[in-house]
């Protein structure tokens, strides 16, 4: 790992400021670009603007992102304001407006304070830097209910990949061709099709596998910008990008609104046929259940076990693919120093040991299928998936009852 987040990539400058709950970040760095965006049909104005930019141009010279207002469900005025943000960044940085991506995060239904953004842009532009402090300031500027900035940079051979992200609530991304935002830069020499393939794979295994509250934002966005110059194989780049995105995604899950515990769910499906899509569905739906999350907050392993079983049965009942018999299930809970098996081949085993639930990190391992009754000679296949999330606390309710 490297210091510097996005600024670890040569030629990238960034900075950001916050005024109370309103922030603004600028990132400057030209390159080929691809993105992944929310599948929510109520797409925010900046997301529509940036999607069009990538379709028409395919290059980004700068990103301007504000926090404190989502500019979502804001009609024609919202689109004009998104366009105005791009104009402001274009003017102060001396880049073409058609290469300025726009992102916003915050409450839905409010118009942007363009006068404030115009003033903030001038201040931020004066302080743009390629030093690590620039990335850190930009990561802080896009925070809303986040409690800490999220940034990471790694080396894959000679190639650098750096990113910043934000997210704490309204986290149940469905990113496709994520409120969480992530901006990733690299100096890898890649064509856009390779970038698009690698980013989709990375998002499918990271941001699309985190759940805080089960609500999909109108503003979720992940951008990948390649400045080029360093050679790397597509496979090696994909491995590095997957790692970086998973680590950023786990930071978001750890920082879930009001969270007291970080939860990892590992699902293995055994039998024929099985699919990774089903394994992912089950892992996500377990973490989406408010009953499961509240039982973990209450440190009740018995309640958590029963509610997980119900969640599995519920999501597999509507699955379009074939899954193993849900009755053939095994389940373990793991803490930092303890491991408790609660279900083996569809039967409750042992006593309820609530001590394993008292740590800050809980891992739940679930195996479906492959138990007693499997046909002799039948070839067993396995599909696995991992999802990350957090518990549901009283603080989450209080925070969202009086949001910002």
Language-model segments: residues:
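A structural signal for small-residue-enriched, beta-sheet-centric alpha/beta enzyme cores
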Residues: 1-66, 70-80, 91-373, 377-404
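Generic structural marker for isolated residues within well-ordered, non-membrane alpha-helices
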Residues: 86
